[in-house]
């Protein structure tokens, strides 16, 4: 009986060793491009309008779209990118009045996967004394 148990355990281990590479190969890659930080930051409340928007990624990306909306629906026209590096995009912004904003971005990562996100922020009207 002990011999049968040992044989069964050995056979199970062999199957596990043979199946493990197949299981690992079928898992999706976990390390995709991600936005590390932005200026303005998501959820920021600003007392003055930013002059530029910065997107900092964890790896080389290609920015395919950046759209800025004010108060939910009004799209703000953005100029071409001001500065670009492998992992950073800096975009000059036009003068922005107070209000709620939403920046929507899309990228293609170095491994070809698309990704995107939303950065909401708010510009407050200056306080009057």
Model regions: which residues?
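A glycine-anchored, Pro-Gly-centered beta-turn/N-cap motif
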Residues: 92, 97-103
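N-terminal export leaders
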Residues: 15-22
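Short strand-edge motifs at loop-to-beta-strand transitions and within beta-strands
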Residues: 87-91
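Extracytoplasmic/periplasmic copper-protein system
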Residues: 32-35, 114-129
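Short proline/glycine-enriched turn/loop motifs at strand-loop junctions of beta-rich domains
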Residues: 58-63
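N-terminal signal peptide c-region/cleavage motif recognized by signal peptidases
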Residues: 26-28
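N-terminal edge beta-strand
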Residues: 31-49
């Amino acid at each position: 009986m002990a011999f049968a148990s040992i044989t069964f355990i050995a056979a199970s281990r062999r199957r596990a060793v043979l199946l493990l590479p197949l299981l690992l190969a079928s898992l999706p890659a976990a390390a995709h491009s991600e936005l590390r930080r932005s200026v303005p930051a998501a959820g920021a409340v600003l007392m003055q309008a930013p002059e530029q928007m910065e997107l900092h990624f964890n790896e080389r990306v290609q920015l395919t779209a950046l759209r800025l909306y004010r108060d939910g629906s009004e799209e703000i026209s953005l100029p071409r990118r001001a500065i670009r590096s492998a992992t950073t995009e800096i975009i000059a912004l036009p003068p922005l009045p107070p209000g709620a904003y939403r920046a929507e971005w899309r990228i293609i990562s170095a491994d070809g996967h698309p990704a995107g996100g939303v950065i909401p922020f708010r510009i407050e009207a200056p306080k009057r004394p």
